[in-house]
Amino acid sequence: MNVFMLPSWYPSLRQPMAGLFARDQARALALVRPGWNVVVGGWGHHDGALSLRSAGDSWRALVWRARTRPGWQAGAGATPGPLHELLTPRLSWTLALAQGGARGLLSASRRNLALAQARFGAIDVVHAHVGFPAGWIAAQLAAEPGLPYVLTEHMSPFPFPALQDGHGGPVPALRLAFEQAAATVAVSAALAERIRAFGLPCSDVIPNAVDEARFAPDAESDPARFVFFTLGALVPQKGVDVLLRALAQLPPQPRPVKLHIGGDGPERGALQALAATLGVQDRVRWLGALRPEQTPAHFARCDAFVLASRHETFGVVLAEALMSGKPVVATRCGGPQDIVTPANGLLVPPQDPAALAVAMQAVLTNPARYDATAMRADAVARFGLRAVGERVAALCERVVAAHTAAGRKGGA
């Protein structure tokens, strides 16, 4: 089978962490179906993103566009099965202006699809990640040759403000992506419920895949102190301000309690000022932006992971923490409810520093209640490459079989 994947977000030179889950799912599919050809069609994503707020970022995008040549890419990662990456560079920009340059991304995707077909023959199914732009692009591509496509949604919140109509619902282009898809998938039950609330189809719930080989339980943590770790962009959605307030509310401890914050973003200055105001600046370590190869070591060195998000459709970092054998504390904000169990951590309401502090205190005073080996085994069984890859492969097989049967019936 030939699968053409269209990700709205994908790792790039400027943002190596963005859309890492899309690449991991492509790798998962190639792993469990080594006889298939899995082709990822990209346009550069963050590398070609123009910014109204940063002339420097826009200049870098223009230079990248001028220097980048289209074609097959190397470096998809060590994958037992055939994973192939295509790049046709295009510029993009905010969704508020001309749909972020979606027409140019469509032309790039048409070229990538043609190159994939020239090398491997007819594409059997297109798999788009995120309803816009990739889902909308898939609808345009599928309308021409009659290709079926699968749409997996990750958007948080759904829909993005720039993709809402005057009543807060999905704009027509986003609705089209769902309505024309052969199957629609959400990465969590909460997201599926949200999608259906708008009258859109959502047939399946399949979680994001995590490469378990990157993470392992490790005794690198320092017994003389307790380290909480959080990882994510420093934006309001991630609730780092709530986490800092919770840290300030922890009662005195017999050993030092530290918070390591991985990630960068526009809120960094304000968050550092808040830490100083709360008097916890000496207990916080700002790690800055981390590359994918750097994150496993930080998971290994912490004692527990905290995610204080205001909303999440999944929460890949929670699965990564569990694969590292670390208990988690998270907010009940969507995706975490599908990940956190009494055996691996605690859930609290979002935007509640007091409740978060109570949960953090419970974890740091009784870490022995969490079995690192058992937590990892459970996470691998639910979110590992093979586990998720098999579910995605079965979905692709189901869609292609239905499309083939419909073609036979129509030709009878």
Regions found by a protein language model. Give the residues of each.
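Nucleotide-activated donor-binding/catalytic signature segment of Leloir-type glycosyltransferases, i.e.
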Residues: 272-290
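Aromatic "clamp/platform" in nucleotide-sugar-dependent glycosyltransferases that forms part
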Residues: 310
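Conserved acidic donor-binding segment of nucleotide-sugar-dependent glycosyltransferases
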Residues: 342, 346-353, 362-368
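Conserved donor-binding/catalytic core segment of Leloir-type glycosyltransferases
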Residues: 4, 221-238, 244-247, 260
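Short alpha-helical donor nucleotide-sugar binding micro-motif in glycosyltransferases
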Residues: 178, 289-290, 297-302
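Short hydrophobic beta-strand element within catalytic cores of glycosyltransferases
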Residues: 327-330
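Carbohydrate-associated surface elements
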Residues: 190, 209
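A short, well-ordered alpha-helix in the C-terminal region of glycosyltransferases
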Residues: 283, 369-382
